[in-house]
Amino acid sequence: MGKWTGKKVAVLYGGRSSEREVSLRTGAACADALRARGHDVTLVDVDAELPARLRELRVDVAFVALHGRWGEDGCVQGLLECMGIPYTGSGVTASAMGMDKTVSKAIFKALGLDVIEYRAFPPARAAEIDLRDLPFGVPCVVKPAGEGSSVGVQIVKDAARLADACREAARYKGDVVVERYVKGTEVNVAVLEGKALGAIEIAPANEFYDYAAKYTAGTTRYYYPARIPEAHASRVMAAAEAAHRGLGCSGVTRVDFIVAPDGTPFILEVNTLPGMTATSLVPKIAAGLGLAFPELCERILDGAALKA
């Protein structure tokens, strides 16, 4: 029996971010899983009426299944703190830092983790960015600092495409981040309650693990455990735990890496509300350990608390 059995659980999903469709799938899957464990669950699509809706439902605890802005960035977490409703996942500060790639990269460097060389530019400068601003040149990776699910991310191989890619990234929230391109093995680590569960390797059909590759079944191959030497796997899982701890995260996170051929685990980001759909990586890793999806969701729910 879970900690919140018999209590009113609201699964918060949807919202207004560019990742709304993914959140709808995550929320529906988690709600079904929690119901299978005997919980009283109501799905709540997040909009401006959220405070009134939570009061009307007399919610005891919130399972946060949002992705992107206004959900993964500390906004909803702050509201829940003010309303005194315990919730899953990380608190306000950890969520905000994890969502902003410029801020999180600075923290990772301070923690002594391996960070790919990068430059960050305000959106107003996007149209002016050229190779003179980049000591590492091309190829490079351009991404918006405040989006997830690879939204707005492009690999630039031709200097003539750099300005267009930067302008595209500037359409989204936050700085424009340009990283040196590092060829290696893409590895994601699931961390639950501060402990790394395992590392999964991502092998997309195309060069880049983009939005379509993440959420379209059959477009990507996954290998669990990751096909990297044991020593490299140990390094990447230790780095994931350090990043989770360093940002002050709670509950479950997914930490993304590029592992270079020499074993250097270059950290890309910490996802404080990772996807929980049929194609998502945290459930795949948990399943590899024998932890079924309903039990995983209940473990996450059991960790719900006020963090402020």
Curated annotation (Swiss-Prot):
It is found in: Cytoplasm. Residues 105-302 form the ATP-grasp domain. Its EC number is 6.3.2.4. Mg(2+) 2 binds at E269, N271. Keywords: ATP-binding, Cell shape, Cell wall biogenesis/degradation, Cytoplasm, Ligase, Magnesium, Manganese, Metal-binding, Nucleotide-binding, Peptidoglycan synthesis. It catalyses: 2 D-alanine + ATP = D-alanyl-D-alanine + ADP + phosphate + H(+). Its cofactor is Mg(2+); Mn(2+). ATP binds at residues 133-188. Belongs to the D-alanine--D-alanine ligase family. This is D-alanine--D-alanine ligase. The lineage of its organism: Bacteria, Pseudomonadati, Myxococcota, Myxococcia, Myxococcales.
